[in-house]
A protein has these predicted regions:
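N-terminal cap/leader regions of alpha/beta-hydrolase-fold enzymes
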Residues: 1-160
Length: 160
């Protein structure tokens, strides 16, 4: 499925997310685990994961539930700061990025998430949800550049 950022595409994407989230466990995580296993089998070495929006939520869940990862970097993970997700504990180092002006993820929930995960690196940016995507109106170049710089340094430190 290839979707853009027009309102109709966003609506279709949300519908697909709802459908996939309704699958019985492990749902999409089994595909992520297969990808991790494939990288280990074919390349060896350490594996990191990064995801944006719903992919950020899946990145968080992967850090908590899957095997074979060495680092995770979720960006504005939609649903990641709920009580249920905050109760999970990561198995690997996590660096998370959130937008201070996100209409879907409140700063109160980010603060609670940060308090629940004191060893995780949590950064916020004066931007909107989707600030890292230069195909969206929410793109914010300075925040995106800083988040990228931090993420690359984080992966270098944890993946080598």
């Amino acid at each position: 499925v290839e979707l853009g950022y027009a309102e109709a595409d966003m609506g279709l994407g949300m519908g697909l997310k709802t459908t996939v989230e309704a699958l019985p466990a492990p749902g999409a995580l089994q595909d992520i685990q297969a990808a991790i296993d494939h990288v280990h089998t074919t390349c060896g070495g350490k594996v990191g994961i990064v995801g944006y929006c719903w992919g950020g939520l899946l990145t968080w869940r992967s850090a908590c539930l899957l095997n074979g990862l060495s680092a995770a970097a979720p960006y504005y993970g939609g649903g990641m700061t709920t009580e249920a997700e905050s109760a999970r504990q990561a198995k690997v180092p996590v660096m998370a990025h959130f937008a201070e002006e996100d209409k879907w993820i409140s700063m109160d929930s980010v603060s609670a998430f940060k308090a629940a995960h004191p060893t995780s690196q949590i950064f916020t940016y004066a931007a909107h949800h989707g600030f890292n995507c230069n195909h969206r109106g929410a793109w914010e170049a300075q925040s995106a550049a800083l988040a990228k710089e931090r993420t690359l340094a984080f992966f270098k430190a944890n993946l080598g």
